Amino acid sequence: MKIQKTLFLSFFSLFIISCGANKIVYPTQIEYTANPQLILDEFIAYIELQGYKIINANDTRMTLRNQNGFFTAEYLETEWFNSGVYDEPTGKEFIIKQKVWIILDSNQISVKSVFGYLDGEEMIVFDSAPDELYRVVNALPEGLKQMVSSKAL
């Protein structure tokens, strides 16, 4: 009986701790089959509809290098976006920047979210987020993923 009680309390404690933990924000990977220019046009409209301002809407083409050589991508980057979610200890508002690479050579899209807050002149960046912030940060990547699958892009 005592072992069952101890085991139950251990599992219950683990459940409570895991529910309250921050979630790690990973880059989102999406496969596409449509014309990259069509995807770029659709993404620009969608991202701006979500309230983000795109920094480089007219200059998106770039060549990048990795261990296998060079590849070409369409790259979109947003300005910092006020999330409306505040860091509890400091009271500072989290801001979010989205970076989107539409890789032309491999039909892959990568969306990376950068988020944190300004502490004076210094930017404090995080890798994980509480649930409320996680939903705001992941709203754009998940929306883009749903758009690609629903429109068969």
Regions found by a protein language model. Give the residues of each.
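Ser/Thr-rich, low-complexity intrinsically disordered terminal regions
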Residues: 20-153
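Sec-dependent bacterial lipoprotein signal peptides
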Residues: 1-21
